[in-house]
């Protein structure tokens, strides 16, 4: 789905299902230079198991507009604002690669949103991919 947020359109994959009132949310976070497509099979599985899925393309990634964010902190803050705009109160967060760092930063900066964390192929530090920043200039 396209969600207008902070003057850009954000692409949010939902696993092929509309959100249902009262269902738990699962937020899938892609890595640097990636998109919601990272989570195609997983998002559909959880959606068909009854979860509300949010797999956003970060600004400047995939099908989302805008310019790439330049820090993990900015990504977590942006994500918290997006979730607030969508009316999400808590969620399980699943991150891959740089998405792990965003999930961890969410737990640190915006812990009220974080019910569970699943971190796949993360690292202690992953810089924002410079070609993304350069490409948006």
Predicted regions: what they are:
Residues 28-31, 55:
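Structural cue for short, hydrophobic secondary-structure segments
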Residues 33-41, 53:
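Serine-hydrolase catalytic-loop signature spanning alpha/beta hydrolases and amidase-signature enzymes
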Residues 38-40, 64-69, 128-131:
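Conserved catalytic-core motifs of eukaryotic protein kinase domains, centered on the activation segment
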Residues 2-9, 13-15, 43, 48, ...:
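Active-site loop/oxyanion-hole signature of alpha/beta-hydrolase fold enzymes
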Residues 33, 58-62, 124:
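Alpha/beta-hydrolase active-site loop signature
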